[in-house]
């Protein structure tokens, strides 16, 4: 039996007392304007899944704790929410389902993934994202309750994983603890998987940024351009694009 199964009766009222609109207001505008498919990993009491459903989205709520899952189904009986027992780092059922999502939320979850399993977990999350999809994580700083299975997290680690998988940083925010614990604080991170209109760009970015053949000058050039684009505030101006096109023609 997990710590969350044992603590469910005490945790659920505390979770439900937090207003999700206030908790997630820092990234609310990044969600699809039209109804989409959203995955809530570590859905807990279903508070956030229910909020996302009221915004019109179809939500898959993944919660491995049976006690938390049962409470969530009781408190939020919404036909737009589909519950599953899937958990990181495997997410086996979701990966086998063939589903993909416009947004994936990990709210107060990443600290439960053991450090040695995070690269694998991140790769599987990215597999579930649609091109153009949004990934939102909150990172916990502060002492962990005894027996909760929490591990230290860092923004730098998440940023490195994002670069390795071709995700673009969209927003970062320092957040207070909504339960009023002075010793606990949070960092919110929003990332997006680029979309070239064909669905091929995420794969190409991953190959270009991680291929071991660093001696090929064309691959090196592409890698440099992608890393420069990762750090740019926006797309090049039309004049800059024309200059790049002219230079590309000279190199061919």
How should these model regions be labeled?
Residues 105:
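A conserved beta-strand element that flanks and buttresses the S-adenosyl-L-methionine
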Residues 108-109:
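Short catalytic micro-motifs in class I SAM-dependent methyltransferases
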Residues 1-39, 44-96, 113-120, 124-127, ...:
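Class I (Rossmann-like) S-adenosyl-L-methionine-dependent methyltransferase catalytic domain
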